[in-house]
Protein backbone atom coordinates (compact mmCIF):
# COMPACT_ATOMS: atom_id res chain seq x y z
CA UNK A 1 0.00 0.00 0.00
CA UNK A 2 1.26 3.49 -0.85
CA UNK A 3 2.35 5.59 2.11
CA UNK A 4 1.23 8.82 0.42
CA UNK A 5 -1.93 10.02 -1.28
CA UNK A 6 -0.58 12.93 -3.33
CA UNK A 7 -3.02 15.53 -4.65
CA UNK A 8 -1.62 17.67 -7.48
CA UNK A 9 -2.78 21.12 -8.52
CA UNK A 10 -1.16 23.00 -11.41
CA UNK A 11 -2.04 26.68 -11.09
CA UNK A 12 0.30 28.27 -13.62
CA UNK A 13 1.50 27.84 -17.18
CA UNK A 14 4.84 26.31 -18.03
CA UNK A 15 4.61 23.25 -15.82
CA UNK A 16 4.44 19.72 -17.15
CA UNK A 17 1.08 17.93 -17.11
CA UNK A 18 -0.54 16.93 -13.82
CA UNK A 19 0.07 13.29 -14.73
CA UNK A 20 3.81 13.84 -15.28
CA UNK A 21 4.15 15.92 -12.13
CA UNK A 22 2.25 13.30 -10.13
CA UNK A 23 4.53 10.51 -11.37
CA UNK A 24 7.64 12.58 -10.69
CA UNK A 25 6.53 13.71 -7.21
CA UNK A 26 5.40 10.20 -6.28
CA UNK A 27 8.84 8.79 -7.14
CA UNK A 28 10.68 11.51 -5.20
CA UNK A 29 8.45 11.61 -2.13
CA UNK A 30 8.07 7.84 -1.80
CA UNK A 31 11.88 7.62 -1.81
CA UNK A 32 11.90 10.24 0.96
CA UNK A 33 9.29 8.28 2.97
CA UNK A 34 11.22 5.03 2.55
CA UNK A 35 14.42 6.74 3.65
CA UNK A 36 12.82 8.35 6.71
CA UNK A 37 11.21 5.07 7.77
CA UNK A 38 14.41 3.07 7.25
CA UNK A 39 17.13 5.48 8.39
CA UNK A 40 15.33 7.75 10.85
CA UNK A 41 12.79 5.21 12.16
CA UNK A 42 10.04 7.65 11.22
CA UNK A 43 6.66 6.21 12.26
CA UNK A 44 3.97 6.19 9.61
CA UNK A 45 0.27 5.34 9.81
CA UNK A 46 -1.02 2.19 8.12
CA UNK A 47 -3.34 4.26 5.93
CA UNK A 48 -1.93 6.60 3.25
CA UNK A 49 -1.18 10.13 4.41
CA UNK A 50 -2.61 12.89 2.21
CA UNK A 51 -0.30 15.55 0.83
CA UNK A 52 -1.16 18.44 -1.47
CA UNK A 53 1.33 19.77 -4.03
CA UNK A 54 0.62 23.09 -5.72
CA UNK A 55 2.71 23.97 -8.77
CA UNK A 56 2.37 27.69 -9.34
CA UNK A 57 4.23 30.82 -10.43
CA UNK A 58 6.18 33.61 -8.75
CA UNK A 59 3.20 35.97 -8.53
CA UNK A 60 0.98 33.47 -6.72
CA UNK A 61 3.69 32.29 -4.33
CA UNK A 62 4.58 35.94 -3.60
CA UNK A 63 0.95 36.56 -2.56
CA UNK A 64 0.92 33.42 -0.39
CA UNK A 65 4.29 34.35 1.15
CA UNK A 66 3.02 37.87 1.93
CA UNK A 67 -0.22 36.60 3.47
CA UNK A 68 1.19 33.76 5.58
CA UNK A 69 4.78 34.83 6.30
CA UNK A 70 4.66 38.64 5.94
CA UNK A 71 7.33 38.42 3.23
CA UNK A 72 6.21 40.23 0.09
CA UNK A 73 8.49 38.40 -2.33
CA UNK A 74 8.53 35.25 -4.39
CA UNK A 75 10.30 32.19 -3.03
CA UNK A 76 11.04 28.72 -4.38
CA UNK A 77 8.99 26.55 -2.02
CA UNK A 78 6.57 27.00 0.86
CA UNK A 79 5.37 24.26 3.19
CA UNK A 80 2.26 24.32 5.33
CA UNK A 81 1.95 21.41 7.77
CA UNK A 82 -1.64 20.40 8.45
CA UNK A 83 -0.72 19.85 12.11
CA UNK A 84 2.42 20.67 14.09
CA UNK A 85 4.78 17.71 13.99
CA UNK A 86 8.13 17.22 15.66
CA UNK A 87 10.81 15.25 13.79
CA UNK A 88 10.11 11.59 14.48
CA UNK A 89 6.46 12.22 15.39
CA UNK A 90 3.55 10.25 13.95
CA UNK A 91 1.87 12.15 11.09
CA UNK A 92 -1.90 12.37 10.97
CA UNK A 93 -4.11 11.56 7.97
CA UNK A 94 -3.31 14.92 6.34
CA UNK A 95 0.36 15.86 6.17
CA UNK A 96 0.02 19.31 4.62
CA UNK A 97 0.67 21.40 1.53
CA UNK A 98 3.77 22.21 -0.49
CA UNK A 99 3.69 25.13 -2.95
CA UNK A 100 6.43 25.53 -5.58
CA UNK A 101 7.03 28.47 -7.96
CA UNK A 102 8.21 27.58 -11.47
CA UNK A 103 10.07 30.79 -12.37
CA UNK A 104 12.09 30.78 -9.15
CA UNK A 105 12.96 27.10 -9.60
CA UNK A 106 14.07 27.79 -13.19
CA UNK A 107 16.12 30.84 -12.20
CA UNK A 108 17.82 29.08 -9.30
CA UNK A 109 18.55 25.99 -11.39
CA UNK A 110 20.33 28.19 -13.96
CA UNK A 111 22.26 30.04 -11.25
CA UNK A 112 23.30 26.74 -9.64
CA UNK A 113 24.10 25.12 -13.00
CA UNK A 114 21.63 22.30 -12.29
CA UNK A 115 18.86 20.80 -14.32
CA UNK A 116 15.35 22.01 -13.56
CA UNK A 117 14.38 18.43 -12.61
CA UNK A 118 17.28 18.04 -10.15
CA UNK A 119 16.52 21.35 -8.46
CA UNK A 120 12.79 20.56 -8.33
CA UNK A 121 13.66 17.21 -6.73
CA UNK A 122 15.68 18.99 -4.06
CA UNK A 123 12.88 21.47 -3.35
CA UNK A 124 10.27 18.71 -3.10
CA UNK A 125 12.43 16.90 -0.54
CA UNK A 126 13.12 20.17 1.31
CA UNK A 127 9.44 21.09 1.49
CA UNK A 128 8.49 17.55 2.46
CA UNK A 129 10.92 17.54 5.40
CA UNK A 130 9.34 20.77 6.67
CA UNK A 131 6.02 18.91 6.89
CA UNK A 132 7.72 16.39 9.19
CA UNK A 133 8.84 19.15 11.56
CA UNK A 134 12.36 19.69 10.26
CA UNK A 135 13.54 23.28 9.95
CA UNK A 136 16.60 25.45 9.41
CA UNK A 137 16.01 28.36 11.77
CA UNK A 138 19.31 27.85 13.57
CA UNK A 139 22.62 26.24 12.65
CA UNK A 140 21.97 22.93 14.42
CA UNK A 141 18.54 22.51 12.79
CA UNK A 142 19.96 23.50 9.40
CA UNK A 143 22.76 20.95 9.63
CA UNK A 144 20.29 18.18 10.54
CA UNK A 145 17.85 19.10 7.77
CA UNK A 146 20.55 19.55 5.13
CA UNK A 147 22.08 16.20 6.08
CA UNK A 148 18.72 14.48 5.61
CA UNK A 149 18.14 16.25 2.28
CA UNK A 150 21.59 15.27 1.04
CA UNK A 151 21.15 11.63 2.06
CA UNK A 152 17.68 11.37 0.49
CA UNK A 153 18.92 13.00 -2.72
CA UNK A 154 21.84 10.54 -2.82
CA UNK A 155 19.31 7.67 -2.80
CA UNK A 156 17.76 9.35 -5.86
CA UNK A 157 21.19 9.59 -7.53
CA UNK A 158 21.70 13.33 -6.99
CA UNK A 159 24.76 15.07 -5.59
CA UNK A 160 24.93 17.16 -2.41
CA UNK A 161 23.16 20.47 -3.17
CA UNK A 162 24.99 22.13 -0.28
CA UNK A 163 28.54 21.14 -1.23
CA UNK A 164 30.78 24.15 -0.72
CA UNK A 165 28.09 26.23 1.02
CA UNK A 166 27.60 27.35 4.59
CA UNK A 167 24.48 25.88 6.30
CA UNK A 168 21.27 27.91 5.83
UniProtKB/Swiss-Prot annotation:
Highest taxon in the source lineage: Bacteria
Gene3D superfamilies in the cross-refs: Metalloproteases ('zincins'), catalytic domain
Cofactor(s) demanded: Zn(2+)
Subcellular location: Cytoplasm
Main location: cytoplasm
GO BP annotations listed: rRNA processing
A cellular component term, taken from the record's GO annotations: cytoplasm
Listed InterPro entries: MetalPrtase_cat_dom_sf_prd (IPR023091), YbeY (IPR002036), YbeY_CS (IPR020549)
Record-annotated membrane-spanning stretches: none
PROSITE patterns in UniProt: UPF0054
Keyword S-adenosyl-L-methionine: no
Cofactor details (free text): Binds 1 zinc ion.
One MF term in the entry's GO annotations: metalloendopeptidase activity
Enzyme class, spelled out: hydrolase
Ligand binding (Zn(2+)): 126, 130, 136
NADP among keywords: no
Keyword terms, alphabetized: Cytoplasm, Endonuclease, Hydrolase, Metal-binding, Nuclease, Ribosome biogenesis, rRNA processing, Zinc
Pfam families linked: YbeY
Record EC number: 3.1.-.-
Role, per record: Single strand-specific metallo-endoribonuclease involved in late-stage 70S ribosome quality control and in maturation of the 3' terminus of the 16S rRNA.
Family: Belongs to the endoribonuclease YbeY family.
Protein name: Endoribonuclease YbeY
Annotated source species: Agrobacterium fabrum (strain C58 / ATCC 33970) (Agrobacterium tumefaciens (strain C58))
Name of encoding gene: ybeY
